[in-house]
């Protein structure tokens, strides 16, 4: 699904959340993190006992999958509540946790925010309830996003491996018949496209760290690390990161790549009117683009990202989320079974993938003909799902997040994002971001490696 990272919580909200570390999470009748494995008898009893669960999620039409769960387990009544997206969603979760009342049982949780809630002991470790047995059902790198040191903090629901959506007609006017295979070819194509058509080969948004981090992910960069306790690693201004951003600075300063904020009217228009000849985006992008630039149907094609070396096939990820269970739940078994079932039952996961167009993290869906064999008219009949399914297998599994990514995203806009918007020194922007992140970590009591 489209990531909700453009507008996140400010530093004060993050600091308040970190203070919750000193709070004791409610055991909730088995909601603690050190529970013995639930026996099958206990699971059967929990699922056959009249129970009310509350599920906070922004996912459109997720009631469809919840209805399937309730048909399977009629004694479980699930109330689906949309309390907002992005900052509103996470702030309300934190407020409910701090107040020790009104918190839901199950919550939608983007991967980059799991560490911050795990730090405050707000998430139930699902491993004792059987989640550790699900690892083989998911792509390796996805499972790493929800697990740490044997604990499992969420059940993956959707992901966003990166690819390249491009206008075949615009590139064709520049004499380009295939998507650039390498970043060197991409830069050459950018010159040709601008000269022949006036279009930008793509746009690099100054307000969206998610896209930049995905590109760094593809480049093998490891900007963050977290030991699960009080030690973090911050390395956003490494030589490799500066090399990658130097590439983009060159294209920006030569006016070959635009720098419009994304998910704005100006940006939507650019996708629809040919200002941008392409969009480096995630697997949720193809369907999103159809709704944004519908009149350009048939003109777009999809490809993997350009590579740093010929013959390579490596990608990064942008977006996606899981379903997590709060540690305060009074019904941990039923809550876990809800999160597990809607993201593992084949009827449910196929519905997510083929009707709501969430890009799947489950191996069996990524191989299912009902999903991968779909031909997309918008992309000239191309099997776009098949392409992105293949790309999903090329994402590096070793990518971590800071336990204060709320501040990570907002400080990006004040540093790297500002440099992009001003078409300035992106290396200096990375240095400033590094300083902001390390200073914040120290102020919050973290040890910085």
Write out the residue ranges for each language-model feature.
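C-terminal lobe and pocket-closing loops
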Residues: 47, 284-296, 309-411, 444, ...
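Alpha-to-beta junction loops
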Residues: 97-109, 124, 198-200, 273-282
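Extracytoplasmic/periplasmic solute-binding protein
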Residues: 153-157, 162, 184-233, 240, ...
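Hinge/lid segment of periplasmic solute-binding proteins
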Residues: 37-42, 111-162, 215, 301-303, ...
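A structural signal for short loop-to-beta-strand junctions that line the ligand-binding cleft
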Residues: 103-105, 133-171, 201, 312-316, ...
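Glycine-centered hinge/linker elements that transmit conformational signals in sensory
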Residues: 190, 230-261, 305
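Short helix-initiation/N-cap motifs at beta->coil->alpha
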Residues: 82-93, 112, 183-188, 260-273
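Conserved N-terminal structural module of periplasmic/extracytoplasmic solute-binding proteins
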Residues: 2-11, 15-16, 20-115, 134, ...
């Amino acid at each position: 699904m489209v990531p909700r990272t453009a507008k996140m919580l400010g530093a004060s909200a993050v600091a308040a959340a970190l203070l919750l570390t000193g709070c004791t999470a409610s055991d909730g009748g088995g909601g603690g993190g050190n529970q013995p494995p639930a026996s099958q008898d206990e699971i059967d009893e929990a699922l056959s006992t009249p129970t009310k669960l509350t599920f906070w999620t922004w996912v459109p039409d997720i009631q469809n999958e919840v209805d399937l769960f309730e048909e399977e387990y009629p004694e479980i009544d699930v109330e689906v509540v949309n309390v907002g997206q992005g900052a509103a969603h996470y702030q309300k979760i934190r407020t409910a946790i701090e107040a020790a009342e009104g918190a839901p049982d199950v919550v939608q949780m983007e991967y980059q925010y799991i560490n911050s809630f795990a730090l405050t002991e707000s998430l139930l470790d699902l491993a004792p309830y059987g989640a550790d047995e699900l690892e083989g059902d998911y792509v390796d790198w996805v499972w790493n996003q929800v697990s740490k040191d044997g604990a499992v903090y969420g059940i993956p629901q959707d992901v966003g491996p990166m690819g390249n959506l491009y206008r075949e007609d615009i590139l064709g006017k520049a004499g380009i018949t295939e998507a650039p295979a390498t970043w060197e070819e991409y830069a050459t194509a950018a010159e040709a496209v601008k000269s022949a058509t006036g279009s930008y080969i793509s746009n690099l948004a100054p307000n969206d760290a998610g896209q930049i981090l995905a590109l760094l992910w593809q480049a093998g960069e490891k900007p963050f690390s977290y030991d699960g306790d009080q030690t973090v690693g911050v390395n956003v201004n490494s030589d490799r990161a500066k090399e990658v951003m130097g590439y983009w600075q060159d294209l920006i300063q030569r006016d070959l790549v635009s720098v419009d904020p994304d998910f704005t009217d100006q940006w939507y228009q650019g996708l629809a009117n040919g200002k941008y000849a392409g969009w480096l985006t995630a697997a949720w992008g193809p369907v999103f683009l159809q709704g944004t630039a519908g009149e350009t149907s048939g003109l777009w094609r999809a490809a993997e990202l350009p590579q740093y070396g010929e013959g390579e096939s490596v990608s990064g990820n942008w977006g996606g989320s899981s379903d997590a269970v709060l540690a305060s739940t009074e019904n941990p078994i039923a809550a876990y079974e809800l999160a597990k079932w809607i993201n593992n039952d084949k009827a449910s996961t196929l519905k997510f993938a083929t009707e709501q167009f969430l890009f799947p993290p489950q191996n069996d869906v990524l191989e299912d003909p009902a999903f991968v064999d779909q031909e997309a008219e918008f992309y000239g009949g191309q099997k776009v799902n098949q392409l992105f399914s293949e790309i999903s297998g090329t994402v590096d599994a070793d990518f971590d997040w800071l336990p204060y990514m709320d501040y990570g995203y907002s400080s990006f806009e004040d540093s790297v994002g500002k440099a992009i918007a001003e078409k300035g020194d992106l290396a200096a922007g990375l240095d400033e971001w590094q300083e902001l992140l390390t200073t914040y970590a120290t102020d919050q009591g973290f040890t910085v490696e």
